[in-house]
Amino acid sequence: MAQVINTNSLSLLTQNNLNKSQSSLSSAIERLSSGLRINSAKDDAAGQAIANRFTSNIKGLTQASRNANDGISIAQTTEGALNEINNNLQRVRELSVQATNGTNSDSDLKSIQDEIQQRLEEIDRVSNQTQFNGVKVLSQDNQMKIQVGANDGETITIDLQKIDVKSLGLDGFNVNGPKEATVGDLKSSFKNVTGYDTYAAGADKYRVDINSGAVVTDDAAPDKVYVNAANGQLTTDDAENNTAVNLFKTTKSTAGTDEAKAIASAIKGGKEGDTFDYKGVSFTIDTKAGNDGNGTVSTTINGEKVTLTVADITAGAANVNDATLQSSKNVYTSVVNGQFTFDDKTKNESAKLSDLEANNAVKGESKITVNGAEYTANAAGDKVTLAGKTMFIDKTASGVSTLINEDAAAAKKSTANPLASIDSALSKVDAVRSSLGAIQNRFDSAITNLGNTVTNLNSARSRIEDADYATEVSNMSKAQILQQAGTSVLAQANQVPQNVLSLLR
């Protein structure tokens, strides 16, 4: 090797090696201080890219796990609200069962309906006000997508359904709706009800007042109707021209009449104070003249005492065929009803419903006036109409009865099959709750899987970018020794050119 001064190749070589050991020492210290094998892309370009992708996945999946927990919270919030809705529905069903019992009064039904209405309003309130982070979960149909992965499209959808009174089919639910009016209802629910029932007997038409029972003809100018005292037929004539049968007279009868023989036989066979019936009237034996049948009997007719005297039976003969009969008053028998009377002529009596029925009259429709309005009722009296529309009896808020037509009643009518309607609503709530319960379990599974994936990805990333302290400490020690040795050797290498000076001496 030539001895030169300008170029110290040994020094340059030593410096180069010293720089290398310096770089190794710097790298080892950086890794040991950061805990990472890859602190920049120069440390491991491919490894850095892989580790970075792992980091993205880990962070994304960690957030996805938190999202899934939010999904559970949403489902729990919604399911809790549905539980309260279910409780209210159960109470409504209980009240509906109570309402269907026939022993309830109008006030009972009103109280039941009032509580049902409050329960239904509470269902709507829960539906409108239940929310999670500002999102109303029961006020409308909605699909809420929960991101449960680190990439696009990795979602779980929560189906949120609108649950309120209307969607449950309970809008207008009523157990105390208007009742179809009957004639009996009109009479019992309103004051000063007037009107009449119509009847037809052949071609003849009649009206019967619903209050007094008076019978008149069904004409523009009605006439009062009577019963003919002689033949029982219906007539508009009230004349007194029907002769009654003169049964007991104030003049002595001829011997051996049926009446005289009957009374004499009763006296003969009885004793004073005994009673007996004759033609439906009770007589008392007042006096008895021996045992031949002569004597007196008495009775009360229309509040007046009548005495009958039996005489002319030969003493000891006891032949009632000889008996004569004399009355203290003239007594007649009505040809209409057979009753005893003091009038020799019977006046036609005012007709009654029973007289119409006796003449085979057939009932027709009725005209009922309530508060100035005239309503029509069918023959059975169980349907009342006005202008062709069926009428219903409704109650105001203060409990006062009022009449409304079928159009107004339609919006307030009692719910048909109320228990079936509530059961259907309960089934819908149960279906939504079941879906929410299933989605909670799915989120639990997703969270567990995300946790496992994050753990595995962290392990994989660690193997790529984390520093191996055993290796790096060894590398640092080696670099430190090389630094010390290199520094010492460099000092010696820098002294080599001075050997040339010895040649110049």
From Swiss-Prot:
Coiled-coil boundaries: none
Entry annotated with the keyword Lipid metabolism: no
InterPro entries per the UniProt record, alphabetical: Flagellin, Flagellin_C, Flagellin_C_sub2, Flagellin_N
Major site of localization recorded for this protein: secreted
One Pfam family of this chain: FliC-like_3rd
Annotated keywords: Bacterial flagellum, Secreted
Matches recorded under SUPFAM superfamilies: Phase 1 flagellin
GO cellular component: bacterial-type flagellum; extracellular region
Localisation: Secreted; Bacterial flagellum
GO molecular function, one term: structural molecule activity
Note: Individual Salmonella serotypes usually alternate between the production of 2 antigenic forms of flagella, termed phase 1 and phase 2, each specified by separate structural genes.
Family of the protein in this entry: Belongs to the bacterial flagellin family.
Role played: Flagellin is the subunit protein which polymerizes to form the filaments of bacterial flagella.
Protein name as annotated: Flagellin
Native species: Salmonella senftenberg
